[in-house]
Amino acid sequence: MIRLVQRIARPFALQTFLLLALFLSISSAQAQPLDLTAYRGRIVYLDFWASWCAPCRLSFPWMNQLQQLYGSQGLVVIAVNVDRDRAKADDFLRETPAGFKVVYDPSGQIAGKYDIKAMPTSLLIGRDGKIHFVHSGFLPEKRDEYLAHIAELLRSAQ
């Protein structure tokens, strides 16, 4: 699992965020604050998306299901939108509603902290604050693989 993260993330970013993922608090005049310290002790599925991204549209119903089915077990889904034009994100959300927290990052500040290069990119952060899994893109046929990683963390010690 760690090898997958190492191949995707830059070594420095990996080292930093393995230790600090749940302690990150970012805000600016352009971005909404994202204070992951509020989710300490929970599992966070952090998804970066954009309105123009077709796979993002496919992932939203699945993320809604994740939040609905596993929220009571400690899973929190947070989607970070990177559109520069908030109206485009709002249009997307009218067509594809989100039953989870959505944060806007038009400046790319939050995405930059995680070195996000593709849409969608999702990070699975454990109760321990470490990034356990990173995947770029969303392939419906890989949902079982994604879910296996989530289930593993849900079974982990509270």
Kindly give the residue locations of the regions a language model identified:
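Short pre-active-site segment immediately N-terminal to redox-active cysteine/selenocysteine motifs
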Residues: 42-44, 48-52, 118
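Conserved redox-active cysteine motifs that mediate thiol-disulfide chemistry
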Residues: 48-65
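Bacterial N-terminal signal peptides
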Residues: 11-25
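Boundary at the C-terminal end of the N-terminal hydrophobic targeting segment
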Residues: 29-33
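Conserved helix-turn-beta segment immediately C-terminal to the redox Cys motif
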Residues: 42-43, 60-80, 94
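Short, internal strand/loop/helix patches
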Residues: 90-128
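Thiol-/selenol-based redox modules, centered on thioredoxin-like
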Residues: 124-158
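N-terminal secretory signal peptides that target proteins for export/translocation
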Residues: 1-10
